[in-house]
């Protein structure tokens, strides 16, 4: 019998295992996929020019202490997000304009800019206030909330773009309280949106985010991680837990940590069943339509025209793109996010239609026209990832509670049930939705287990 079974080898699960092992506990990690990392997935280019991050990619070593410490510990290399050059806003399919990166689009009137600034500053101020979310804010959608503050049409569109980019949902689909609390966990709205050293999109891993996952797995120990081991049943027998996999293996431990999205608890056979209120809140959580298309080129042709590769779009299918090149290894790419309603439509297309739609939009955004000789039409590799299609993810980034549920079920959401403990970036109060948040939650979940087992001695292996 082990001291602890961890279900899920994403960053929360790996960190939970590491923290528990450091306290002297015996740990086994069970992962349904044939790889570690969860929603972090770095795929090598066939050309040998680095990696494409199909999942989480951005970090900030100064604001995210755990990630920063691990990068130093393992000697991992990072790349700074490229900001130099002009950005582009695509208002409609055939309407685009250029503007200096980091400023409000220049075609807005003074009144429209002031209106956006008012709403932005209000959310920023609310997100910097300590304390729990307000029930009143949890019972209205983000769109209803900003309309109540006097948001104009362009501000409403921009905030909806934020919702799509940040969570893969429309602003009419989740609560204002959840949005504000998410900002609160992540140093405020401005830090989340920032691509410089003040924000969450400052750096990327040179060799892909999975390089950190691999390093963490080495600490856990490969023999302690069982891949391709989907869970069949989880049984809490009061004194210990028994977890059986669909491959016929059975594991026993005094405690079990679930490190999977709460949206997927209902798919597990847990006995006895989770309490009704826990089921009510977790059965209703949703993951956004959060997708990526990564278009790789032989060279960064967009820089020739003074662009930094960043664009945002109301028309889609791509709603935002960034230059994710690693010049050192001759990796030149545009990472395109296809989220929210646009992502739902795009995800229904077959792969070559998805990729064609993205390249067609890139041609319009960068003024390539119908010139088939333009480099935009000549990628060397194209990747796409629809996270809703991924069996053991069902979307990204972090599960979002239903309207009114965040405050109504705060007393049970993410809290231990018997010998079962729950971790994941969704539960973190630091950098929720980011790798740092996953590491934070894993630490806390393991600390719960260590405390609960305190004084009871180690299990006999």
What spans do the regions from the language model cover?
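Central beta-strand plus flanking loop segment that forms part of the substrate or channel wall
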Residues: 277-305
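N-terminal Rossmann-like FAD-binding beta1-loop-alpha1 element of flavoenzymes
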Residues: 2-29
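Dinucleotide-binding Rossmann-like beta1-alpha1 core, especially the glycine-rich loop
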Residues: 48-122, 131-132
């Amino acid at each position: 019998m082990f001291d602890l079974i961890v279900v899920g080898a994403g960053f929360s699960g790996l960190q939970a295992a590491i923290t528990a092992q450091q306290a002297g506990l015996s740990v086994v990690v069970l992962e349904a996929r044939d790889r570690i990392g969860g929603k972090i997935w770095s795929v090598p280019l066939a050309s040998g020019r680095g990696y494409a991050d199909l999942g989480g990619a951005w970090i900030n070593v100064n604001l995210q202490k755990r990630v920063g410490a691990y990068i130093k510990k393992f000697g991992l290399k990072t790349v700074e997000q490229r900001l130099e050059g002009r950005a582009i806003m695509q208002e409609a399919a055939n309407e685009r304009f250029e503007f200096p990166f980091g400023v409000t689009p220049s075609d807005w009137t003074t009144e429209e800019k002031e209106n956006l600034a008012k709403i932005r500053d209000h959310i920023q101020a609310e997100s910097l206030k300590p304390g729990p979310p307000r029930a009143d804010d949890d019972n209205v959608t983000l769109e209803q909330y900003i309309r109540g503050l006097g948001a104009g049409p362009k501000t409403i569109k921009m905030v909806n773009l934020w919702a799509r980019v940040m969570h893969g949902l429309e602003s009419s689909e989740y609560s204002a309280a959840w949005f504000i609390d998410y900002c609160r966990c992540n140093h405020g709205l401005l830090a989340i949106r920032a691509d410089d050293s003040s924000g969450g999109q400052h750096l990327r891993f040179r060799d892909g985010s999975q390089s950190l996952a691999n390093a963490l797995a080495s600490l856990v120990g490969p023999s302690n991680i069982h891949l391709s081991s989907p869970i069949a049943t989880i049984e809490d027998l009061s004194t210990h837990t028994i977890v059986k996999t669909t491959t016929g293996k059975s594991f026993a431990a005094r405690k079990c940590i679930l490190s999977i999205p709460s949206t997927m608890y209902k798919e597990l056979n847990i006995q006895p069943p989770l309490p009704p209120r826990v089921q009510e809140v977790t059965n209703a959580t949703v993951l956004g339509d959060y997708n990526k298309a990564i278009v790789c080129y032989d060279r960064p042709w967009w820089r020739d025209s003074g662009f930094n590769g960043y664009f945002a779009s109301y028309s889609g299918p791509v709603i935002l793109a960034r230059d994710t090149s690693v010049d050192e290894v001759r990796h030149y790419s545009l990472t395109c996010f296809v989220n929210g309603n646009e992502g739902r439509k795009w995800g229904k297309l077959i792969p070559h239609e998805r990729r064609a739609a993205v390249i067609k939009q890139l041609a319009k955004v960068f003024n390539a026209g119908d010139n088939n000789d333009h480099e935009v039409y000549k990628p060397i590799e194209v990747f796409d990832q629809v996270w809703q299609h991924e069996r053991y993810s069902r979307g990204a980034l972090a599960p979002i509670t239903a309207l009114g549920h965040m405050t109504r079920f705060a007393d049970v959401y993410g809290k231990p049930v018997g010998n079962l403990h729950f971790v994941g970036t969704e539960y973190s109060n630091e950098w929720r939705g980011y790798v740092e948040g996953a590491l934070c939650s894993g630490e806390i979940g393991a600390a719960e287990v260590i405390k609960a087992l305190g004084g009871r001695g180690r299990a006999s292996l």
